[in-house]
């Protein structure tokens, strides 16, 4: 789904919050909830900076800038919140290189899936 379609859904469904979710190296689901007023096309396409040193096993404080990059194809309305909230799963990017962070479990899974597709191993 494109960023424009996500923004249209946010408007049409009167969404109040956007919950950006990702998994830490230990497999625990983490999230960052944002008021919908700060969500725009740039944020959906480029991501949001966050402090990676707050996640165990990721970055030291002096190199902690990371990016949560929403995957607009992985979105759903959270049925358990009292306010209209949309959830977007995110990839983690290195803020300096703008490339996938090598310790992001989601990124590791994507690399493994790609490797399996290119190898003789078929699942």
Regions found by a protein language model. Name each.
Residues 1-121:
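ATP/Mg2+-dependent ligation/transfer catalytic cores
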């Amino acid at each position: 789904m494109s960023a424009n379609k996500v923004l249209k859904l946010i408007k049409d469904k009167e969404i109040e919050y956007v919950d950006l979710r990702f998994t830490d190296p230990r497999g625990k689901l983490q999230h960052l909830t944002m008021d919908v007023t700060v969500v725009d096309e740039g944020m959906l396409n480029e991501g949001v900076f966050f402090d990676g040193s707050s996640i165990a096993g990721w970055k030291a404080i002096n190199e902690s800038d990371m990016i949560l990059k929403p995957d607009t194809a992985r979105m759903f309305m959270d049925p358990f919140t009292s306010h209209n909230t949309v959830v977007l799963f995110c990839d983690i990017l290195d803020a300096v290189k703008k490339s996938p962070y090598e310790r992001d479990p989601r990124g590791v899974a994507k690399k493994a899936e790609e490797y399996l597709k290119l190898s003789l191993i078929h699942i």
